Amino acid sequence: MVKRIDPHTHSAYSDGTDTPAQLLAIAAQAGLDTIALTDHDTTIGWDEAADAVADTGVSLIRGAEMSCSSSGITVHLLAYLFDPASPGLVDNFRRTREDRETRAARMVENLSADYPITLDDVLAFAPEGGPVGR
């Protein structure tokens, strides 16, 4: 029997638009057997996704799309089944989140020269615990 798998999905905790539970429901409606939740540099949606497995029948692979840099080159690495409490990963995710927050503040500052917008306006749209992106 052929299994239908999507090994690369994002929820609203990253650059997707659906909650992890909604993502699993959509996967079930699409006839998928398994999805991997691979939000950018976070595992915050894992528990919510795991709670939705019983309701949807879709298997979950826990993962993340990790931002990695070396010698000025940045790549996104898909990683699966790792320990989310690993001190190195926790530190990497924290640094990446801080970098994104700094970048978002700069973007809002630049935009505010021509548009009436504040960082608080932008943060109001971010899911609790989720990232502020472009």
Model-identified regions with their sequence ranges:
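An N-terminally biased module of ancient metal coordination in phosphate/nucleic-acid-related enzymes
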Residues: M1-I73
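Extended substrate/RNA-proximal surfaces in nucleic-acid metabolism proteins
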Residues: A52-R134
